[in-house]
């Protein structure tokens, strides 16, 4: 894996996060930070998926969302803004659009070819696979962001000596 592909992936995630952040009325001073957090999280996912280990998208997205959660939690305390202002735009580029699109496409094909002689079980299998993958990826992204929040709070309490 080349560093340029990793940088390009992070750059596109940065642009998407800034776009989502501007739609959601994120303060302009925080938009670059939303982009940077998204680039780090998405590049983490990309590196894990394309490394020699070939980690699947669910676990790689989980690791990327943990990075986003931890960085967003510390940055939100530093900039005195809600956690969601930084984390949600950064998580949105990691939403599995191709799996969601494949789910809807398979469902439409199933209903279109259900009455003909074409075996429609194939489309049901594709629908089930894509729907389960979409739900698992999003579930692990949310859990990863929550793990990031809890980890930063534990670190904060640990550093205080509580």
Give the residues covered by each predicted segment.
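Ordered, amphipathic secondary-structure segments that act as subunit-interaction surfaces
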Residues: 72-90
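Hydrophobic alpha-helical membrane-insertion segments
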Residues: 85-104
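Alpha-helical transmembrane segments and their membrane-interface boundaries
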Residues: 1-67, 71, 82-83, 105-162
């Amino acid at each position: 894996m080349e560093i340029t592909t990793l940088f390009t992936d992070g750059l596109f995630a940065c642009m998407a996060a800034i776009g989502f952040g501007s739609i959601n009325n994120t303060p302009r001073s925080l938009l670059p930070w939303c982009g940077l957090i998204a680039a780090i999280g998405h590049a983490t996912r990309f590196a894990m998926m394309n490394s020699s280990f070939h980690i699947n998208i669910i676990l790689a997205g989980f690791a990327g969302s943990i990075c986003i959660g931890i960085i967003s939690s510390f940055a939100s305390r530093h900039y005195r803004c809600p956690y969601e202002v930084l984390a949600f735009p950064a998580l949105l580029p990691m939403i599995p659009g191709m799996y969601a699109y494949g789910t809807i496409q398979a469902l439409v094909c199933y209903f279109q070819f259900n009455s003909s002689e074409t075996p429609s079980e194939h489309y049901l299998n594709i629908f089930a696979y894509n729907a389960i993958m979409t739900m698992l990826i999003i579930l692990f992204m949310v859990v990863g962001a929550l793990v990031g929040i809890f980890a930063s709070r534990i670190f904060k309490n640990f550093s205080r000596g509580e």
